[in-house]
């Protein structure tokens, strides 16, 4: 599964929960992006960012190792986090072996409330 494939699946699964990106000319887009969105865009509501390149891990095995790939997804809450938990539940029900981690907000550091999800390919 590529990052583009994952984006397509998540866009469908999270339809109605995603916030919006607004660019400099006022155009709006669903707040889901592979990589980092342009710095000139602003996000409102729930934002979903998908890593461009999957992480790889090698599990030692007899003679050869098994390589597993995972995609890292970040759900960022711009405002009330109500959609975040609903979105997290949808993603985890779609990929039962995925792992989620909460990153608590920190106003002093400018960190918004968010969850990172590691999804196996």
Predicted regions, residues:
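Polar/charged side chains located within well-ordered beta-strands of beta-rich proteins
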Residues: 7, 47, 69-71, 102, ...
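Small/flexible residues
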Residues: 9, 51, 74-76, 91, ...
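Oligomerization/assembly interface segments of phage tail-like spikes and tubes
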Residues: 64-79, 109-121
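Exposed beta-strand and adjacent loop surfaces of beta-rich binding modules
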Residues: 11, 70-72, 85
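Small/polar-rich, solvent-exposed N-terminal microdomains that initiate assembly or binding
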Residues: 1-63, 81-83, 106-108
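Generic alpha-helical hydrophobic packing signal
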Residues: 16-17, 70, 87-90
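Short, low-complexity, polar/charged sequence segments that are solvent-exposed and flexible
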Residues: 53, 68-72, 92-94
């Amino acid at each position: 599964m590529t990052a583009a494939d994952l984006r397509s699946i998540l866009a469908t699964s999270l339809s109605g929960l995603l916030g919006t990106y607004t660019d400099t000319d006022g155009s709006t887009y669903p707040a889901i992006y592979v990589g980092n969105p342009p710095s000139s865009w602003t996000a409102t509501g729930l934002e979903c960012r998908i890593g461009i390149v999957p992480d790889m891990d090698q599990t030692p095995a007899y003679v050869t190792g098994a390589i597993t790939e995972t995609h890292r997804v970040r759900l960022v809450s711009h405002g009330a986090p109500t959609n975040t938990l609903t979105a997290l539940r949808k993603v985890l029900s779609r990929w039962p072996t995925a792992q989620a981690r909460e990153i608590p907000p920190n106003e002093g550091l400018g960190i918004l409330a968010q969850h990172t999800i590691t999804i196996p390919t």
